[in-house]
Amino acid sequence: MAEHEEQPYEGNGNGGDPAPASAYAEYPAPEGSPPAAAAKPTGFSDGATDGGRSQHETQPHDGRSSKSRERERERDKDKERDRDRDRDRRDRDRGDKDRDRDRHREHRDRSERREHHDRERSDDRDRRRGHDSERRRDRDRDGHRRHRSRSRSPSKGRDRRSRSRSRSRSSKRVSGFDQGPQAAIPALAAGAAPGQVPVVAPAISGMLPNMFNLTQTPFTPLVIQPQAMTQQATRHARRVYVGGLPPTANEHTVAVYFNQVMAAVGGNTAGPGDAVLNVYINHDKKFAFVEMRSVEEASNAMALDGIMFEGAPVKVRRPTDYNPSLAAALGPSQPNPNLNLAAVGLTPGSAGGLEGPDRIFVGGLPYYFTEAQVRELLESFGPLRGFDLVKDRETGNSKGYAFCVYQDLNVTDIACAALNGIKMGDKTLTVRRANQGASQPRPEQESMLLHVQQQAQMQKLMFQVGGGALPTKVVCLTQVVSPDELRDDEEYEDIVQDMREEGCRYGNLVKVVIPRPDPSGAPVAGVGRVFLEFADVESSTKAKNGMHGRKFANNQVVAVFYPEDKFAEGQYDG
């Protein structure tokens, strides 16, 4: 074993010479590094301290720490920028929401104001309507008594005036008169043009000469537009009323019977086949409506009036909705004169022809008038379909009245207007429809009828006074009111006030006289007439021209001058 001298080991672990003292430098410990542990006593010398870490170990760690801090600062800046952006975004969103909220609040305020305004207007309308309803109820309550008199039971058989107006004199009353007349009556044509209805000149030789000089003034043309030839348009002219049916009648038996009868008399003018299209029966009232296939066949059926059906005579009439003026444009309105009525036991011009709504009653005939004279008077307006002068069975003398039906039903109202009220000797004619109210003048006939009434009234007055009817201060209105209306005190008061208000429109009205029926039933002169006395002729002339032809409670007014001396003496039947 070699002998060596034992030396203490003070190396740096490299097996080399000990490092010089300058090779060690004091580096501060990195921030955050744990404090150096206390030196552990060893057998070595303390040449190596905590400051004796190598330079190679310290420098890289310090560089990484700087970069980490820079990255952290960059991240912090990025986060700050993100926070700023988020804050700006929230501010913008908050601003948008605030603006939306403001807009919504403004819209809601406007809507609330508009709704409030609408509610106020609606409340105002409701209040006004309430006031109007209250006023109407007051008027209805006030007028109840008068309406009661106008709406009496139909069983009394009277046509009541239906003028709804308040009894309260403070409110505006509704007059019984219609609207004011036209400014002037249309000028009359010099000659009868196509479509005009000429006046038939009377040809009463030696009895009433030149009484109706109407040939020089033809009527205003009646313009009738032809309707479309459809089933619905012609239905009113194709229907036939059949009354007085036996209880055993039904739709089938009526249809079969009329088909056979129409074929037997030669009335099927529309060709082969059945003439009846439909039958409707009212078993309670024992009548039927028979619908024919053509207007001409319906007119031919009119000749069957009075025919025997199952042992009972039946009435064949036009229905109430039949309009002769319109039907004239659709086909013949009269039966074919060549019908073979004898084949079914009928004769032309039999008593059956004197039935129906167009039958005329002629009363007030002088007893010494013969049948030929009365017929001559009536036929001055057209040929007659039927005529019957009623005579006493024992003596054979005339009873002073007759019935007739014209072949042309359109002249029915014309003849009534022209003949009614004419003085014949010591008698005054009463000429009207036998079934008064069953058939009123159609609207298409009113202008023609108005002119006829004007001419007739003028001729009647001229005939009565023996010369021209000079204007007077007194105007007489006829066909205005009925005796039944005059019996009721309230109704009478309303009529007087209506006449006074209407008369004052034309000038200085002095007096209104409306004769009333006697409660005991004794005859009173002038009942049904209204007399208006004016201060001057100018006012009375205006009133006559303005009120003539007007409607008062659905009655057509006839206005004429009345003699002042008779009015002053209280003679109201002139």
Curated annotation (Swiss-Prot):
Disulfide bonds: none
Coiled coil region boundaries: none
GO molecular function, a single term: poly-pyrimidine tract binding
Residue ranges, compositional bias (Low complexity): 18-41
PROSITE patterns: RRM
Segments forming domain RRM: 238-321, 358-436, 479-565
Location in the cell: Nucleus
A cellular component term, taken from the record's GO annotations: U2AF complex
Biased composition (Basic residues): 144-172
Segments of skewed composition (Basic and acidic residues): 53-143
Cited Pfam families: RRM_1 (PF00076)
Start and end residues of each stretch annotated as Disordered: 1-180
InterPro entries assigned to the protein according to its UniProt record, in alphabetical order: Nucleotide-bd_a/b_plait_sf, RBD_domain_sf, RRM_dom, RRM_dom_euk, U2AF_lg
GO biological process: spliceosomal complex assembly
CDD domains reported in the protein's UniProt record: RRM1_U2AF65, RRM2_U2AF65, RRM3_U2AF65
Source superkingdom: Eukaryota
Main location: nucleus
Family to which the UniProt record says this protein belongs: Belongs to the splicing factor SR family.
Role of this protein: Necessary for the splicing of pre-mRNA.
Domain observations: N-terminal RS domain has a very strong bias in favor of D over S.
Name assigned to this protein: Splicing factor U2af large subunit A
